[in-house]
Structures are given as structure tokens and as C-alpha cells.
Amino acid sequence: MQKNYKAKYVIQNSETILENFFIEITDNIITNLTNEAVNDSEVIDLGNVAIMPGFVNAHTHVGLVSVKGLGHSTASALYDVMWGIEPHLNEDDVIKLSKLGILDCLSSGTTSINDHYFFSEGVATAAIEMGIRGFIGHTVMTEYGPWLGDDQISM
């Protein structure tokens, strides 16, 4: 499916700002950038907005979203709260927490994350389902987390 989105500004980089441009998207891929709508596809006028590339967060733990904002002046949120909870987490819990963390990322314009957390396959599942680009690594800890045994090391 092809659509054209019209925006007041399209910011390509720090030096190139286009005014009153159309972004053609076909099957969720940007296929054209032009100053007039192409083809007979649907035009969606976004009004007085700026469209720009998404942000990349190169160090996330999206599954830790539940302690966001707690204990910023100390590490107590991590040590006292999450390290008490994490040994009891399962993959389904991590998927749900990761989806919430990814929603937080997307709502602030972050479209790519580099994340590592327990149950990395669950984090990857959440990333795919939420539509964010993810570079996902696995966390291995013998204390405080859900240690699944030596099989974790061979992943």
C-alpha cells in the first residue's frame, strides 16, 4: 500500500531542512521524498509538523521500565527494588515489561534500541511486536537475576 505524507518540514540531517515536502511510503518503507505528491496514492496532510529521523538509544534495559524515576539520586531502585524482583521474573513478565519500556522509547522518538536484559528472546519478541529496531543481547548474572543454569553461557 502506498501513501504520501505531507509535512511542513522534513529534517534530513543537521544541515538539510526541507519545507512543504511529501514522504512517499510503500509497504512501510520510505520510497520517495519530493516537493509534490506522486502517483494517485492517498495524501495525508500532517499539518504544521516536522518529520525527522528517529533517535537511537545505544544502551537500554527496556525491561527495567518499572523502576524508571525511582531513586535517581541513589542506586536503591536497582538494588532494593529490581534485584529483589528479578529472580522471580519469567519470560512472559519480561515480554510485558519490555513492551512497556519500548512504548516509552517510541513515544519519545526513539526508533532503535541496543538492549540487554534477562530473557533476551523475550525482549526480541517484544521489539518485533512493537515495531522498534532492536539490537538485543543476553544478560548473564549468577546473582540477583533469574539464573537459568549453565545453558545460558552457551547461548
Question: Residues of each region from the PLM?
Answer:
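N-terminal metal-binding scaffold of metallo-dependent hydrolase/deaminase domains
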Residues: 1-39
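Divalent metal-coordination and catalytic microenvironments
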Residues: 8, 23, 28, 48, ...
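Hydrophobic faces of well-ordered beta-strands that scaffold small-molecule active sites
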Residues: 54-60, 113-115, 134-137
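Active-site beta-loop-alpha junctions enriched in small/polar residues
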Residues: 61, 118-119, 139-144
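Active-site mouth loops of central-metabolism enzymes
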Residues: 83-95
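Short, acidic/polar
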Residues: 92-102, 117-120, 152-153
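Metal-coordinating catalytic core of metallo-dependent amide/deamination hydrolases
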Residues: 124-155
